[in-house]
């Protein structure tokens, strides 16, 4: 990442809001100048009367390293010879009223381990990537046609050493990656890993946007972690927060003594809900900073996607009783997504949005925001509300399951059971389920199975794969001791089999964003709380028949309408004894019988498992499948 002194063109683009590689200009960069090696520093501080560089190399007295002002809009630079790598530094900002503030570099690419807050000089060059096969594979197929089953995790609490130390990026490469591979997840999604001062903010209140947190090691170790994920066919998505930032004194807040990265007006600037400051998305220089940041992570860390946090907080002005659209934010999101699509068309842009904003995943040129995917918060809330309802009462809220298919194809959706649903007293997925010990596990398997066959990409939070009983405890590691309990072992086996089935079943992902991929068989059976539907493949005769029973009642000799006059074999049943179920499965192929049922030309007779999902595949029998 070779730096250069600011050119007039760079300066123009930065202030216009389109210097999308601003990290090549700002920050600290190794240079050789006039036969001397050192680091060049560049910072934006338009309200400062003077800016200096302070660090270990001058005993933290910046008076001998005063920066030069490049233009009237506040870009400052300085080359300091003799500085090596991993030198600590900050900017000594002299405000208009003479106050001196020590600030970390907004474009720092490496930082001290908290609670220390200095930036570190660092050279990002030199890592030799080995993920060429992965990159070629990503570019070869349309993004929407790929299987996506995401494992969301918090690096600080996935696993810890016995003395409480975090696992490093290197150690996670050796432990996390094989674990993800074993379970069959296609992607991991990391809660924010850019630098943040407070552990319990989980990274969502950050300030070092270009600096991977040093809690887990240096930047090159994170590169290697991502590289090794790719070599194992695992994509890496980052949680990314372009809406607000923490207000710690060393960070972006009031950077040069006045609002700079944040809005000028207090009611717009202060995020009273989270105690943070909102980015001024009407300021072109902030556009350059944030859009460059997304491009930076894609370029230098080969990141495969961004889950954009709290989009509702971005789209609407904060701290108001009624929602009012922020036009600057709308323009920013469109610009961000359009830029990313042009530069990295295979990198997913995912909106965490709980609003009814139209066309979140629509093309920018057609009036949309330009995201690839949107979290389906409505589906998540409805399904969890339904599952937490006692089974005998579920017939009264049948619509909580059926309603999602009225809008499932209006956007490109991700179905999320995220960290937000298993923390702060909300209970774990398993413990949300009503009933006794066995019933909780049965409904947990049904829930994951139903999510897997519902249109949309998938996401679960760490611990859900083995049915952790306790909700997420962010200061502790996951309850790995549960692996010694048979039902948790079997839950893990179920998750692995379910995800392997998903990855092998193109029916479930190749065109799950198209309405013709789904058809109800019987959506009106509220008395028995049984739902049946079909997932169609792209070729004639490709079909999965799916039956979900949300009560503990077993049904034998149950008739289900089917689309083709052929045989059906059960390819997955959550009630299998292998998974801890009661064994109410369909061992033999089921032959379709003549006679219309459920508006289908024929039907099969089968066993319906308690609290279970049964997935049947249509198979050819003596020639072509007949409809």
UniProtKB/Swiss-Prot annotation:
Induction: Expressed exclusively on media containing carbon sources that allow efficient sporulation. Its EC number is 2.4.1.18. The active site is at 309 (nucleophile), 352 (proton donor). GO terms for cellular component: cytoplasm; cytosol. It is an enzyme of class 2 (transferase). SMART domains: Aamy. Transmembrane segments: none annotated. GO terms for molecular function: 1,4-alpha-glucan branching enzyme activity; cation binding; hydrolase activity, hydrolyzing O-glycosyl compounds. Pathway: Glycan biosynthesis; glycogen biosynthesis. CDD domains: AmyAc_Glg_BE, E_set_GBE_prok_N. Catalyzes the formation of the alpha-1,6-glucosidic linkages in glycogen by scission of a 1,4-alpha-linked oligosaccharide from growing alpha-1,4-glucan chains and the subsequent attachment of the oligosaccharide to the alpha-1,6 position. Belongs to the glycosyl hydrolase 13 family. GlgB subfamily. This is 1,4-alpha-glucan branching enzyme GlgB. It comes from Bacillus subtilis (strain 168).
